[in-house]
From Swiss-Prot:
Signal peptide: none annotated. Residues 1-12, 37-53 have a biased composition (Basic residues). Residues 151-255 form the KilA-N domain. It holds the Pfam family KilA-N. Residues 79-120 have a biased composition (Acidic residues). Residues 1-129 are annotated as: Disordered. This is Putative KilA-N domain-containing protein L32. One of its GO terms (molecular function) is DNA binding. The lineage of its organism: Viruses, Varidnaviria, Bamfordvirae, Nucleocytoviricota, Megaviricetes. Residues 14-36 have a biased composition (Basic and acidic residues). It comes from Acanthamoeba polyphaga mimivirus (APMV).
Amino acid sequence: MPHKAPKSKLFRTRYVEDSDDETRGRSRNRSVEKSRSKSLTRSKSKSPKKSRSKSLDRSKNVKTTKSKNTNKSNKYTEEDSEDSEDSESDQDDDKSDNEQSDSELDDSESDDDETDDNESDNDKSKDNFENIIESKENDFRNIIFENINEKFAIGKFGDFEVIINRDNGYINATQLCKDCGKDYKNWNQNEKSREFVKKLSQYTGLSNTNLLTKIIGGNNVKLRGTYVHPIILTNIGNWISPTFAIKIGEWIEEWKKFSRKNTLKYYKELSKIELYSNNDKEKQIQLALQKSLGGKIEVRTKHGYVDLLTKDKIIEIKSYDNWKHALGQILAYGELYENKNKCIYLFDIPSKNEIANIKIILKKFGISLLCI
């Protein structure tokens, strides 16, 4: 007959086996939970403290439900506590790694922000620099290559050296004309030049004295003269040199080719060109003389159009500033009408004039002078 083990011993053996099975099961569960916790923490975990608290709650629940036998349960709880501590230690390490990773990410983002700020600052400074360059390219002061003093400098205008007022970019037109073999007074007294300055004053809102400034006196003679607005200087350059006038035409053509809008704008402005006021005045005088003397106006010849042709006279009408032009034209027409008296009619004669000298010159060519 087989020997039966005491009941208490069997119970104790079964309990130990059950306890071992449960212990192994719990160990597997803890291993799974531990690996899952690490995986979640490394990938997207934003709150390590939460994971830690859940793990602690789990370990506490296991301790409470499984402590039936005093000795075994004490042994079990000690083992479980050690495992919990290991789990907490691992989670703390993961937390530390995660916090370090977050810190590195923050530092990286901070560096990126600083880089963006630096790039933004660089872009702003670049824009400002480009604006400065652009403004200098549109300013006559950009041609300066040597300073005379704090207010005046020397620049290059075509093939000529010019004196520039550094405060406003105005150029000494008197000296420029002199260097080119011209007299600034001739340009300034020209009726078309006066009309030009008048229109420019209306366009810019600047008075004549602000468009044309005079420097009188001083030890340096070259600094004396009339300093003119850059737009006026272009007109003077056109008057001085036909080559310069051609260059202006080339620049305009290049500007037109740059954009179709520029071409349309050019022809639009061209269609709004007003007749030179002297042309109107010349026409009025022409009609008045025709009414008084009779004859025909604008008579066509191989040399041009005669202003007024009467039975005994050839009359050429011009402003005082253009009397030399009138002289050349009347001599040409005189070859075609040798039996008629040659006459020049001048208008807009200034108070300070050289009418007496002009009469002497005209008399040498058999030309009479009419004027009002």
